[in-house]
Design a protein with these regions (language model features):
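Cytoplasmic-side transmembrane-helix entry/capping segments in multi-pass membrane proteins
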Residues: 35-43, 65, 85-86
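Alpha-helical membrane-inserting segments
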Residues: 5, 47-51, 55, 68, ...
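Interfacial segments of multi-pass membrane proteins
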Residues: 24-25, 88-99
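Short juxtamembrane and helix-loop transition motifs at transmembrane-helix boundaries
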Residues: 5, 20-32, 46-48, 63-73
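Loop-to-transmembrane alpha-helix initiation sites
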Residues: 59-63, 97-109, 113
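Single conserved hydrophobic/aromatic residue that forms the stacking wall/gate
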Residues: 1-11
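Generic transmembrane alpha-helix signature in multi-pass membrane proteins
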Residues: 48-52, 85-92
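Structural signature of hydrophobic alpha-helical transmembrane segments
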Residues: 9-17, 51-69
């Protein structure tokens, strides 16, 4: 059915749930800021794609993918903890570079727009 096919991909978007918790509950944390959310997700997913293409789907590649993602986020000052799961999802499911753009970049952008509107409604300064 259409519903079961749609639910089959839900696990690929799990990090977004944790991102939502940050932007709604601790919106003033540096880890929840738009730059961190968007670039953290993009850079970590890209790290997963790179490691997958270099090493395939192995236990070592899973660890290296997460390590690379954390390193890149730290070096770019874009740490966003939920994004740390992206390399695992990318490697386990064998995603290509297109995954970085859709659903990752588009989804992260939508979360930022939602966070802005939600926090504005509550009269809180998100951006």
């Amino acid at each position: 059915s259409r519903v079961s096919r749609g639910l089959g991909d839900v696990y690929k978007r799990q990090p977004f749930g944790a991102s939502m918790v940050l932007v709604m509950a601790v919106y003033d944390s540096p880890l929840a800021k738009p730059k961190n959310l968007i670039l953290g997700h993009i850079l970590s997913a890209l790290s997963g794609v790179i490691i997958f293409y270099l090493l395939g789907n192995t236990f070592i590649s899973l660890g290296l993918g997460v390590a690379l993602a954390v390193f890149v986020m730290m070096m770019t000052n874009t740490v966003h903890p939920p994004a740390g799961a992206n390399p695992i999802i990318v490697i386990l499911t064998g995603q290509s570079i297109s995954f970085v753009f859709l659903p990752v970049a588009v989804g992260a952008f939508i979360i930022v727009v939602f966070a802005y509107l939600y926090n504005r409604l509550l009269k809180r300064n998100y951006i």
